[in-house]
Amino acid sequence: MGGMGGGSSIAGVLSAFGGAASGISEIPEIFRIAASACTGPGHYIFQLYEWLCIQVERVPFHSIVAGRPEMWKIGVFYVALGIRYVWSVGEARDNLERKGIFLFPKEWNAPGKNSVFIAVAVVFLVVQPVHGFQSWFLDVGQGDGVFLRTRDEAILSDCGSSQDKKIGKNVLEPFLKSQGIRTLDWILVSHADADHTNGIEWLLKEEADIRVRNLALPAAGKGQEAYKKLETLARKRGAEVYYLHRGETVRAKSLALRCLYPEAGETPAEERNSHSLVFDVTYGKFRMLLTGDIGVEDERKILAVEEDKKREKVTLLKAAHHGSNGSSSEEFLECFSPAFTVLSYGEGNTYGHPAPEAVERLEQTGTEIWRTADSGAVNVWTDGKRMYIKGYKKQDYGKKRDKKQIKN
């Protein structure tokens, strides 16, 4: 009651100041300063409340990240809860027990057993086992955001948007929490353009619920202010920071992530796209290329050292630079021959992505193209032998759910 009384007192003070300001504002111009003086305290009290709420949100473990359970689990939970309730209080239980029929052990009717039952049911609802390898190409508008997950690791590769400046709060945070993610083992930054990083910056600055263990940046960008900023933010969160180049690998238990680009010792280019990190990700027979925003010249450099891989087809390609005409060259596509390609871009973007010429080159390879602007987030699942791919917008939900054998 004391807390309520305190709240009522503050509300009364705010009302008094507001009423005074309203009355004074009806008086001629010279009294407007007095009205401002009356509204000022209320404004600052609200600011104090907002600041206190923000500080509480930054306290570690102030909330539990449980994830979003599947619909069938929610259904089972409520059915079990209903049966347990009816059995606890209903006449049906008494009639059956007289006949020696027990739906639940007798001990379950002891005081406190309902709490145990509910606790077990909640654990069933919250625990979300991960099977195989899943990739999500997030619907971030004009930008990139890829999330990789196995039973052993959670990895974010880029997250940014030039169409939504609050992509971290609006898309990244809700998505990660819906998956029950409390720790990101790696954040991979292909390059430091805002349409690949502003969501990551927000996460490192504002999101205290999600721990970040490691941050990978392109070696060719070391020393540039944009990368220094990301490095500083990550280290403040207790993360290790690595600058990677071709030939290095990302430590992961279930996945193999090999860096194909940039070259070691490459001079930082003013155009960040050309030193994007490129990763070859493999899980069993499934193989995926994450290409950042590399251009045709960068693709040629990769091809020059990937001759031995030409016979190994790529299952899925994240098309470079949102489908720009300056990427996805004919030689590159012919070399890796992807079965599926994801184009990440925003509808109506000012860059004209994807370029019709790039789309035509992709279509000529026979690849199946998925577009985040059309399908929303694109989800790919594989057990290393089979896979499926689906979109999350209404017209695509459930499409391509049939598992296909992976061919190399």
Residues of each region from the PLM?
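Non-globular, low-confidence helical/coil segments that flank catalytic cores
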Residues: 3-408
